[in-house]
A protein has these predicted regions:
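Short amphipathic alpha-helix with an adjacent loop that forms part of the alpha/beta core around
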Residues: 217-228
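Glycine-rich beta-strand-centered segment in the early N-terminal region that forms part
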Residues: 32-50, 59-103
Length: 351
């Protein structure tokens, strides 16, 4: 079969710093697929992950841990693709691979480009057959699930019977982290952005309770549920919600800092913490990154896969279809429009 000569790609049109990111910051256009050269691979995109951390690479500020996206290259994120043609050792036509994939229907990547993308750790990994659902590789068996695993097992280290309050609980990381914490014997209270999401947490995932963080009585709601406060706060959002939770915690207690999605549009660099609750409650604040546990990643993925297979972890996905939906899928994370992991499928024949 002849290789495609035209493709569509989604580009960032301008940076957004100190203002909300919108669909107007992206454009999708058709262009030629250049001829394959030595040490390059031609990929058909099957599925793309959209993740909050990508927002930091759309600000124009060079203080983030991944480089800023440029306007002359498509945006990229973790994705799954099929090899259509290859002049790169180790990859054959028909291979299905996981890595940092362009927001394109079809793309050409060089070995240098693959190695230079920290989103994927500079790797393009061949997936073994038979394939699991593609959302698993981008969610619970990908960076999302690994972040949740090491956030709980490595950083939180919950003791049986401890109570954990978890923000962003209906998101990709939060929904997995809460289930892992329960498997380790913790009581989990989830915070989510709507009554419907709270119902998903309690009825589908088995959380002990869930609260709507938008409630004007959140402090009272937390204290009514936990008069002595939680032992652990697993923070995915930062901002005012986190300050509220910290003001209700027992003495002493632990705060595990995983993400600050509420602050990603802040030009000053994020959440400025009021340390008074930390001081008054004797809180221990700890941050982590899944990269700190790189040598243990394979074991974490194997354990997560086992938990899925035996029904101990339920996967939640919000699925979009087609390249043109990628910006909306990404922005919906910040609008509260997703439940669980957000994935865009570009090939209708795969799931």
């Amino acid at each position: 079969m002849a290789s495609p000569t035209r493709t569509r790609s989604t580009f960032l049109t301008r940076y957004a710093c100190g203002e909300p990111l919108t669909e107007d910051h992206f454009t999708t256009r058709e262009h030629d697929v250049r001829e394959l050269r030595a040490n390059e691979v031609l990929l058909q995109t099957l599925a793309l992950s959209v993740d909050p951390y990508l927002r930091g690479a759309m600000t124009g500020l060079d203080r983030y841990y991944i480089p800023q996206f440029t306007f002359d290259r498509p945006v990229h994120s973790m994705g799954v693709a099929r090899v259509l043609d290859s002049r790169l050792d180790g990859y054959a036509v028909g291979d299905v691979v996981l890595g940092a994939i362009d927001w394109s229907d079809v793309s050409v990547l060089s070995a240098e480009e693959i190695a230079g993308r920290p989103v994927s750790g500079g790797a393009l990994v061949r997936l073994s057959q038979p394939l699991r659902p593609l959302s698993h590789y981008l969610g619970v068996l990908g960076t999302t699930g690994v972040t949740a695993f090491f956030g709980v097992v490595g950083a939180t280290r919950p003791r049986r019977g401890e109570t954990i309050v978890l923000s962003g609980a209906a998101g990709g990381v939060g929904s997995v982290a809460g289930q892992i914490a329960q498997l380790l014997g913790a009581r989990v209270i989830g915070l989510a952005g709507s009554p419907k999401k709270c119902e998903v947490l309690t009825k589908q995932l088995g959380f002990e309770a869930a609260l709507d963080y938008r409630s004007p009585t959140l402090t009272d709601d937390l204290l009514a549920l936990l008069p002595n406060g939680p032992d652990v706060y697993f923070d995915n959002v930062g901002g005012a919600v986190s300050q509220t939770v910290m003001s209700t915690m027992r003495k002493p207690a632990r705060v595990i800092e995983c993400g600050q999605i509420a602050s990603y549009d802040d030009p000053d660099g994020g959440w400025t913490i009021d340390i008074r609750p930390i001081h008054q409650h004797g809180l221990r604040l700890e941050s982590f990154s899944p990269s700190h546990y790189g040598e243990f990643r394979a074991g974490a993925v194997a354990q997560l896969g086992h938990w899925i297979d035996v029904g101990k972890i339920i996967t939640l996905d919000t699925t979009y279809h087609g390249l043109k939906t990628v910006p909306t899928a990404f922005l919906d994370i910040f609008r509260g429009g997703n439940v669980g992991k957000s994935v865009v499928l570009l090939d209708s024949t795969v799931g």
